Every structure is written in structure tokens, then in C-alpha cells.
Amino acid sequence: MKKPYKSPTKAQLRNASNQSKDVIASWVKKSRKNLELSQEGLADIAGIDRKTINRIENGHFSPSIETLVRISVSLNSKIPVLV
């Protein structure tokens, strides 16, 4: 019997990961600016290092679920759909 699905290729995983980073980066930056918060301000509220916020906003870091929740609560904004 044939499998009903295929495992994703490395290229598909890399593409999905990059798209997710872009969605998260845009969401964090837009939500933060809408609240007129600096990266430092968001970092202080969320209990996250400012460099981490910067790396997330620039798409250079994939945050953990815990970090996403901290940011979401701090921005009073729902985490966007990633895939």
C-alpha cells in the first residue's frame, strides 16, 4: 500500500523555514512599531535580549515557542499562521 503522503524534501523544509522567518519578522516589527515601541522596549517587556528581537526582525533567528508567546503577549497580538 502506498503512503498517503511524502516526506518533505530538504529544499521544501528550507523554503518553509525561510517563509516562516519572514512572516515572524514582519509581524514582530509591524506590531512593535504600531505600539510605538523600540526594540529595547519590547525586549524589556517580553524579558528577551534586545539582540534577539533584532535578529528575529531581520529574519536571522527562529524563535522558540516560548519566545513567540512572550512576544505575542507583550504585543497583545496573536501569533500569525506560519505555513
What kind of region is each of these model predictions?
Residues 47-62:
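Recognition helix of helix-turn-helix/homeodomain-like DNA-binding domains
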Residues 1-30, 34:
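N-terminal flexible/basic segments that precede or flank functional cores
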Residues 64-81:
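DNA major-groove recognition helix of helix-turn-helix/homeodomain DNA-binding modules
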